[in-house]
UniProtKB/Swiss-Prot annotation:
Listed GO MF terms: D-ribose pyranase activity; fucose binding; intramolecular lyase activity; racemase and epimerase activity, acting on carbohydrates and derivatives
GO process annotations (BP): D-ribose catabolic process; fucose metabolic process; fucosylation
Name this protein carries in UniProt: D-ribose pyranase
Predominant location category: cytoplasm
Task performed by this protein: Catalyzes the interconversion of beta-pyran and beta-furan forms of D-ribose.
Cross-referenced Pfam families: RbsD_FucU
EC main group: isomerase
Gene: rbsD
Coiled-coil intervals: none
Similarity comment: family membership: Belongs to the RbsD / FucU family. RbsD subfamily.
């Protein structure tokens, strides 16, 4: 059995295979997932697993140098944004933050190596995580 925190084999595999600047999208239950992009569906029920708990587990294995978020998060879910930034800080990361419209965000998800769907049901609980390097 794995000794690290992240136990989902599919998600752990995707993290291990992506290179520098490649991306993984973490999303709420409602974000449309484009065909052709690998879907890792963790959603079990409304609110489970949460966006933040899943992000915390991902950050235990993935070095992130940049994040992309929809700018609308500030008007509709500022608390989640602040909690997300605290998680990056807890993992000793200070990624560059790129803000785009929600429409552009959805377009950018097409370039993700994988999209991880959570059971989160709060607005704009979505982030594109761009991989950094550990050296």
């Amino acid at each position: 059995m794995k000794r690290t925190r992240l136990l989902n084999s599919e998600l752990s595999y995707e993290i291990s295979r992506i290179g520098h600047t490649a991306s993984i999208t973490l999303c709420d239950a409602g974000l449309p997932i484009p065909s052709g992009v690998k879907r890792i569906d963790l959603a079990i029920e409304e609110g489970y697993p949460t966006f933040l708990r899943t992000l915390d587990a991902i950050l235990s294995e993935l070095k992130v140098e940049e994040i992309v978020i929809a700018s609308e998060i500030h008007d509709h879910n500022q608390m989640l944004f602040e909690q997300m930034m605290k998680l990056f800080e807890a993992h000793r990361m200070a990624p560059k933050i790129t803000e785009v419209s929600h429409v552009e965000f959805k377009q950018r998800t097409q370039a993700s190596e994988a999209i991880v769907r959570t059971g989160e049901c709060t607005p704009y609980a979505n982030v594109i995580l761009k991989s950094g390097v550990v050296f």
